[in-house]
């Protein structure tokens, strides 16, 4: 008779060899379905190429792409994934075959914390996605609607500038101030008020944290029990429950409000109005969908936007020549006024400010690997056979540093954008911070309005020094790790008022 320990060991050994067999059979069947596959690095049983991703997958995938080409096939566990690492490959996927690659793969943890993937970013391609994106484009993120929230952006930017002005000569954490700015702007626009409470900050941080944790079950379904054993799944369910309770409370508060003027309407008011209109038209707009869009406005409007602003001001501070040239342009725009407004920026040309925004987003794409897509049908990409169900990763970070496109690709040179029409709005596949095609970010105008106003005023109002006698050129620009790639270390500076 075997002891219980021996039985356990035999069970694990049997399971291991069974999974190797299943994995090899699956790889074999995939190869038979698609005869002309993209080049592929050798993978290990069960985990495939997961071990080769490291702490910075976008960088590891660049190393692999140098060997296997701009369109390669990897296996993340049992999931086949093609990785596009050139503008040409990205264009075939997001333009030529955009519809075939317009759905999202189901991600377990993301689904749990997003009302069963009801937010637009995670939603599979279909009627729900079309309806929700239409609400965004027509009701929440239209040019008229974005402009209607101008006073909120200017109010909160001015409050940040006041705090910095009162701290001149002292060390400040500019990273934290920028994060607070975007949080306050989005909370006022989305929910009608700011949330200073620690529980709110901790809840939103926990949601982002669980989204950034690697989920074994996404790639090796037979090992999904590891997500439960590690506590990840439990954390996700707990965060989802707390998030639902918070958003439900916000909705109920708004349902009891009296009619508001258009200037005073926030996103929740607009969504409730949309819900009533669609109910009258016989196209129900469900409660979970409403709360999912409320959640998405916060996540999409804060994390990536603050990351972008943080990198922009970091690069300008690190390069005094760029700072001086931008200040000269902004001085011309402001004409001696205390602050720069959105109207000032609309009524004047500011090519150098625009060039800095583009160059910073080229070097520091907030989300270096665009959210994964999935093929709904068999298709040929760059001459290779891609089977339905294959996932797609676009390495936007590698494309933005491609030396065949960008001279001195790893250096910060805003001047490169003064003589080119390349933009970040999804029409130029050399620069994809917001993605492109059907799954491109619908909130570009919203994000860039905050970006531009904040950067313009920070540079117009202040000069900056580094603490401890460091030269500006010594500013540490190390990346963090995660879905969103922020600065690894807070941006600590000493501001000085220019006037």
UniProtKB/Swiss-Prot annotation:
Pathway field: Secondary metabolite biosynthesis; terpenoid biosynthesis
Subcellular localization, as worded in the UniProt entry: Membrane
Main location: membrane
InterPro entries: Cyt_P450, Cyt_P450_CS, Cyt_P450_E_grp-I, Cyt_P450_sf
Annotated signal peptide: none
EC number: 1.14.14.-
Cofactor: heme
Binding of heme, residues: 441
Positions of transmembrane segments: 2-22
Origin: domain of life: Eukaryota
MF (Gene Ontology): costunolide 3beta-hydroxylase activity; heme binding; iron ion binding; parthenolide 3beta-hydroxylase activity
Any one GO biological process: sesquiterpene biosynthetic process
A GO CC term attached to the entry: membrane
Gene3D superfamilies, per database record: Cytochrome P450 (1.10.630.10)
Reaction it catalyzes: (+)-costunolide + reduced [NADPH--hemoprotein reductase] + O2 = 3beta-hydroxycostunolide + oxidized [NADPH--hemoprotein reductase] + H2O + H(+); parthenolide + reduced [NADPH--hemoprotein reductase] + O2 = 3beta-hydroxyparthenolide + oxidized [NADPH--hemoprotein reductase] + H2O + H(+)
Keyword Iron appears in the UniProt entry: yes
Keywords: Heme, Iron, Membrane, Metal-binding, Monooxygenase, Oxidoreductase, Signal-anchor, Transmembrane, Transmembrane helix
Pfam families: p450
Membrane association type: Single-pass type II membrane protein
CDD domains according to UniProt: CYP71-like (cd11072)
Role of this protein: Involved in the biosynthesis of germacrene-derived sesquiterpene lactones. Component of the parthenolide biosynthetic pathway; parthenolide and conjugates are promising anti-cancer drugs highly active against colon cancer cells. Catalyzes the conversion of costunolide and parthenolide to 3-beta-hydroxycostunolide and 3-beta-hydroxyparthenolide, respectively.
PANTHER family given in the database record: CYTOCHROME P450, CYTOCHROME P450 FAMILY 71 PROTEIN
Family indicated by similarity: Belongs to the cytochrome P450 family.
Protein name: 3-beta-hydroxylase
